[in-house]
C-alpha cells in the first residue's frame, strides 16, 4: 500500500521575500519588479493611460460607484397590494360641558320593551284528577335481580415446568419422640387475576434452595498480545526494573516518589540521554503484568517510544515489550505406581490338582502291549519365553495345556513316543521352487510414468486474404 505523501508547503509570498532580501540584495529576479510595480504589464498600462482616459465609464479598479452617473437600477414589475380588513369608523363623541356632574352614575337604564302582549288568565276550576283507593296494603316493589348468580370454581392442573413454591420448603423438624410438626398455609380462593410466576431453581449442596440470581462466572481474561510482531522484544537484567523503572528512563527526583504499579508518563527534553540505552526515547511505560511462558515467571511492561515526526505533525510511536524472568517453574515428574512382575522359576503340574483342566486318553493298542508305560513326555522344543513343563504319564497319547498360569487359551497338542532319531531341521526356510525372471519384460508401466510429448497446436486466424498460423 503506497504511503500518502505530505502536502508540499508553499513558499513565502513576494512581499515577504522583498522585506527580507531587499537589504541584502539577494532577491530573485521576479520579486522586485512585482512589488515595486515595474513589470512590463505595469509599464504598458502607465504609458497607455497617458493618451486614453476611461474614467467616466466606471471600468477601473476603484470603488464600484458606477462613474459620474452612478448605477441605473433595472426595472421591476409592479406589485398589487391586497386590500386589508375594513376599518371600523369612530363612534360619536360625547362632549362634556362644564356644568355636567363629574360623577358618572353606574346604574344603567332598563332595556325592557313592552310589546303589548295579552296577560294570560288562570282558570278558577279544573286541573289534575286525583284517584283515591281504599286498599290498605302497602305497595312493595320486588327489587330482586333475575340474573343468574356468579359462581367461582377453581381447577388445578399439573405443569411439569412450573413447580409450586410450597413444595420447595425444607423438610419439617422431627422431635426425638417421633412426632412430626407440620405447618402449612391454607389456600383461599380470590377473584383477583392469578399471574403464574417463574421460579429459577439452582440446586446447591443442600436440598430446597431457590434463587433467581444466576451462577456468577469468572470474567474472561483479556489477551495481552505481548509477543506479536508489532512489539519489539527487549530483555532487561537490571533489578531496578522491578522496583523503580523510572530510574532507567530519566534521572530520579529525590523529592518525588511515584507508584511503579501504574502507567508512567515522561516528558523528554530536546537533548536527553537515558541512563539505560534500551529505554531511549520512552515517553510512556504501561502497567506491569506477570505472565508464565516457557516454564518461567515473567515480569512484563509495554512502553511507547517516540522516534520520528512527519511534516504534518504526526508522531510515530512504536511499542516495545520489556520483560525480566524472575524464577523458573520446577517440573514435577509424574509418579505412577507400578506393580512388580514376578516370574515363576519352575512350574509343574500335578495330576491331582489340575485333573479337571485336561483329559488323558488311553490308546488300546499301547495299553495291551504295555510298552511305553514308563515313558516321559517332555515339551521343551518350543523356543519361546514360556516355561518348560514336564508331565509324567503312563500313556503315550496325552493332551495337556502348555502351562497352568498361562493367559492364553490352551491348544490341544498331540505327543507321540520318540524313536530316538533327531528330527530333520532344514538350514534355511524352504520356499516354493518357482523360477523368477528379474530382468523380464512381461510387465506394464504405470501410465503416470509415461512421457507424452505435447505438440504445439495451430489455430488458423482467418483474414481477408488468407490465414496466419500461430
Swiss-Prot record:
GO terms for cellular component: host cell; host cell endosome; host cell Golgi apparatus; host cell nucleus; viral capsid. The keyword Phosphoprotein applies. GO terms for biological process: microtubule-dependent intracellular transport of viral material towards nucleus; symbiont entry into host cell; viral penetration into host nucleus. One of its GO terms (molecular function) is structural molecule activity. Its main location: virion. Pfam families: Late_protein_L2. Belongs to the papillomaviridae L2 protein family. This is Minor capsid protein L2. It comes from Human papillomavirus type 54.
